[in-house]
Amino acid sequence: MSRVCQVTGKRPAVGNNRSHALNATRRRFLPNLHTHRFWVESENRFVTLRLTAKGMRIIDKKGIDAVLADIRARGEKI
């Protein structure tokens, strides 16, 4: 399963660990992903999404129906 938020599209970023001596070693910054079930009243069913904490806040703001419409417009199957 890929580490990509289904709402925001956020994916792992790359950067450096920096020690006290400023040695640089490569590392990955992973998104704060959660698997969450949402009740969709219009479809009378649960929908499971893999999303970041920011994606959950977007759903709180816009509503699950609007977010699902955006995801389906991108061609993702839900």
Curated annotation (Swiss-Prot):
One of its GO terms (biological process) is translation. Residues 1-20 are annotated as: Disordered. GO terms for cellular component: cytosolic large ribosomal subunit. The keyword Ribosomal protein applies. Disulfide bonds: none annotated. GO terms for molecular function: structural constituent of ribosome. Pfam families: Ribosomal_L28 (PF00830). Gene3D superfamilies: Ribosomal protein L28/L24 (2.30.170.40). InterPro entries: Ribosomal_bL28 (IPR026569), Ribosomal_bL28/bL31-like_sf (IPR034704), Ribosomal_bL28_bact-type (IPR001383), Ribosomal_bL28_sf (IPR037147). SUPFAM superfamilies: L28p-like (SSF143800). Keywords: Ribonucleoprotein, Ribosomal protein. PANTHER family: 39S RIBOSOMAL PROTEIN L28, MITOCHONDRIAL, LARGE RIBOSOMAL SUBUNIT PROTEIN BL28M. Belongs to the bacterial ribosomal protein bL28 family. HAMAP family: Ribosomal_bL28 (MF_00373). This is Large ribosomal subunit protein bL28.
